[in-house]
Curated annotation (Swiss-Prot):
Subcellular location, record wording: Cell inner membrane
Keywords: Cell inner membrane, Cell membrane, Membrane, NAD, Quinone, Translocase, Transmembrane, Transmembrane helix, Transport, Ubiquinone
The protein's name: NADH-quinone oxidoreductase subunit N
Membrane topology, record value: Multi-pass membrane protein
Subunit description: NDH-1 is composed of 14 different subunits. Subunits NuoA, H, J, K, L, M, N constitute the membrane sector of the complex.
This protein's record includes keyword DNA damage: no
High-level lineage: Bacteria, Pseudomonadati, Pseudomonadota, Alphaproteobacteria, Sphingomonadales
Cellular component, GO annotation: plasma membrane
Function summary: NDH-1 shuttles electrons from NADH, via FMN and iron-sulfur (Fe-S) centers, to quinones in the respiratory chain. The immediate electron acceptor for the enzyme in this species is believed to be ubiquinone. Couples the redox reaction to proton translocation (for every two electrons transferred, four hydrogen ions are translocated across the cytoplasmic membrane), and thus conserves the redox energy in a proton gradient.
Amino acid sequence: MSMTASLALTVPELILSVGALLLLLVAAFGGDGFARAIGWGAVALFAAAGFSLTGPAGNGGPGFDGLYIADSFAAFAKLLIYIAAAVSVAVAPGFFSRTGGGYRAEYPVLILLSGVGMGMMVSAGDLLTLYVGLELQSLSAYVLASFMRRDTRSAEAGLKYFVLGALASGILLYGISLLYGFTGTTLFAGISDSLAKGMGTGQMFGMVFVFAGLAFKISAVPFHMWTPDVYEGAPTPVTAFFASAPKVAGMALLLRVAIEAMGSGTDTWRQIVVFAALASTILGAVAAIGQTSMKRLLAYSSINNVGFALFGLAAGSADGVAATMTYMAVYVAMTLGSFICVLQMRGQDGQPVETIASLSGLSRSRPGLAAAFAIFMFSLAGIPPLFGFWPKFLVFDALVRAGFWPLAMVGIATSVIGAFYYLKIVKTIYFDDPAPAEFAPAASKLEGGLITLAALAVSPLGYLAIPLLDATSMAAARSLF
């Protein structure tokens, strides 16, 4: 493939990277007075990048001699990433203005650059492309976590994320070096051909280290330790971003590496994935029960949900991968809706309300917000008829079809345990004695509109999208096999 044809495959990344540089120039000369305009410019760039997926960038095949892959799988993941990133940019100005943190023009630019990295991650066809994309996303994320530099919690979150992220990157690089040393290539196709001839001890160790590095990025147990502290300390729009877009990118990257690069060693890596899935669902469900902070509880909820998504990968089939992609699509809607609800929860003094006990009385002062948050909690718990039930059903169905019904039974049990803390929040909102402090009225029609859209998406109306989701997720999954 010619250089021009290869570049045509990377149009989404070109749009975001060139746009980020132009917006950075505007910020340099215009200052923070242009911050809101730059933010909406970033949203427009994400929309343009998503629209470009209708061309060769959506299904053009491999480019740059296999280093970059533009297929249905990458297009599906990128669309979710761009939606989550755009929402995270759109809701940020209101939060920073209310908290006095100061909304600066660098925020949307960092999200754009992170989007470029995530796009490279899901389209990677080579271990080095994987690493460059992952590091571009991570470096932007470290700065975003500590964006409110005068807030000690935010600074602490950024430092913890940076130190542990650097450790995970080192582990990943070591795994890449082992795989290169024992297979003689960094291309996914070449690694797959090498493993098809038999997996040696060195190759197995390389695979384990690569999986460990990627597990950190998706907060899978036992590499989850950074998640509760970073989610709690980072600004809430940043936390919403961390819990959605990078999760999709990391999960998509793990799926591509497992199926395309290491499909010949499925029986070996399945043991790792099964352990991570079980540990994540169990720890996420149990550890969340004792939490008092809303953001920490949602952090453990994200760990729990990653475990369920990994069950689809453990099935090792196209049905399992399609179920995982459907799970991530619905998860993005539920998570963004939940965090925007948290953004709306403020006292009369304008300060955020982040403790679960403070939610008592929300149903009286903000009945609409309380109802929406309850919908998201029930949906995250997977309680029918809400749409959050459907992806869990697909994941368990894929496990049973693959013959792993004991794993499905454990997953169902942890889902029941996890429902406890979601129901605890609903009970606090509707049945506990009202807290003395009153909630401030809604201050953003945009946030209210986004909450409404997300609530409708995870309501029973979401089942109308099943034919579309099934078709697109299965097309995405089949492009890996």
